[in-house]
Amino acid sequence: KVTFRNRYGITLVGDLYVPKNIRSGQKLPAIAVVGAFGAVKEQSSGLYAQAMAERGFVTLAFDPSYLGESGGEPRNMASPDINTEDFSAAVDFLGLQNFVNREQIGILGICGWGGMALNAAVGDTRIKAVATSTMYDMTRVMANGYEINMKQNAQGGYDRAQPQMDAEARYQTKVQLNNGRWEAAQNGYATLAPANNLDPKDITADTPKFIAEYADFYHTKRGFHPRAVNSNPQGSWATTVPLAFINMPILQRAGELRAPTLIVHGEKAHS
């Protein structure tokens, strides 16, 4: 277990995986891994990190700011700026290890952290490769809603659809969120939105398949972790989280990304 700080002074906690067959003085390529959005390092990112370490990489699965074992108050907060910085802070940490090759540091983002990973790779030229797995751009999701039909098509995939929110709906959402800030401010901005994943027993035939799949992972022994936002039955993200994501889109300079990029998606992936 390791700790390091980002440039905002928040202490991040991660699990560092080093291949068993590393030789004295050897410098290996390294990968920082985060995700999914609302998950902790003991879930998907730790599995990815372990698998890549078995393939010869030094890997770091870490909890981003405000989540899991990492620092930051209030809890269950997210920020497109700070969370992009978290990836660069991980690159800082990896590059300071004497067994890591600074010219071979990459990052991997899962789910909503895929968008953050791409955003970090645009801004941080030390990132020599970037990969995403079933990525979302969470700024786009929170600003537009899902841009797909919620029900699967005959082939089991998801058809594109008009965004769920237009400018007027987005404005009304901001009105509601900002009015709620009075209560959140009184509570130290620690007020949480309702839990964002169903309990498996509440799934019905009308539940969209991807929501049922979330429940089957985050609320069962398969994927549950008590520190994960997505596993918390009492609440999910802080209520003010969407405000920055709606107003500060990431990937505005994605066309300037020069690092080799791998975007991995399932054939029927919801995102």
Tell where the protein language model's regions lie, with residue ranges.
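Alpha/beta-hydrolase fold nucleophile elbow
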Residues: 98-111
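Alpha/beta-hydrolase-fold enzymes
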Residues: 119-219
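The serine-hydrolase catalytic nucleophile loop
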Residues: 38-50, 64
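Conserved alpha/beta-hydrolase
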Residues: 51-71
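Short beta-strand/loop motif that positions the catalytic acidic residue
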Residues: 257, 263-265
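Short beta-strand element of the alpha/beta-hydrolase
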Residues: 25-36
